[in-house]
C-alpha cells in the first residue's frame, strides 16, 4: 500500500546494506580461517559455536536493560567499533594468526546478532498483516546484498588491503543502522489506525 512504501524501502535498504557488509567480509573470514591453520579449523568451529551461544545470552541480557529503540544502534555501533579494532590489528600486526582466528569466530556472531536485530526492528514497526505482505519484498534486499558483496570484495581486493575492507564494511554497517532508526521514526509518525493490520 502507498503508505507502507517508506517502511518497505527502509527495510529493503536495511537488509541490502547489512548483507552487503557481511558478504564483503565472508571471503575474508574463509581466508583468515585457513591462515589460522587448516588443522585448527575443527577448534574454530567449536569456538564459533560457543561464542554464538555466549553472544546470544549476553545480547539477551543487554536487551532487557535498554529501550527497544536503542538495541539496533547499540548493537551495530558495537560491531562497528569491533571492525575498527580489527582494522587497527591488521595494520599493527599483519598476518597475526590470532587476529585471523578471532575474526573467523567473530563474523559468525556478527551475522547472528545483526540479522536478529534487523528482524526485531521490522517486527516492532510493522503489524503482522504488513509483515506477511512485505516479507518477501524486504527479504529481497538480503539476497541482493549477498550477491553484491563478493563482487565488491573482489573489486576492492585488487586495489585495497584488509584494512580498507574492514573500514568499508564499518561504513556500510553504519548505513543500515541509520535505516533502522528511520524505521522507528516512521513507526512513531504512524498511528496504529494508520499502520493497518
PLM segments and residue spans:
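Helix-loop boundary and gating motifs at the non-cytosolic
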Residues: 2-54
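Intracellular juxtamembrane helix-capping segments at the cytosolic ends
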Residues: 112-127
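Intracellular loop-helix junctions on the cytosolic face of multi-pass helical membrane proteins
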Residues: 1-12, 38, 65-70, 88-101, ...
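Hydrophobic alpha-helical segments of secondary membrane carriers
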Residues: 75, 137-141, 168
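Hydrophobic core of transmembrane alpha-helices in multi-pass small-molecule transporters
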Residues: 16, 20, 96-114
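Conserved MFS/SLC helix-loop-helix module at the cytosolic interface between two early adjacent transmembrane helices
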Residues: 56-75
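Small-residue-mediated transmembrane helix hinge/kink sites in multi-pass secondary transporters
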Residues: 31, 60-64, 150-154
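Glycine-rich segments within core transmembrane alpha-helices of 12-TM secondary carriers
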Residues: 42-54, 132-157
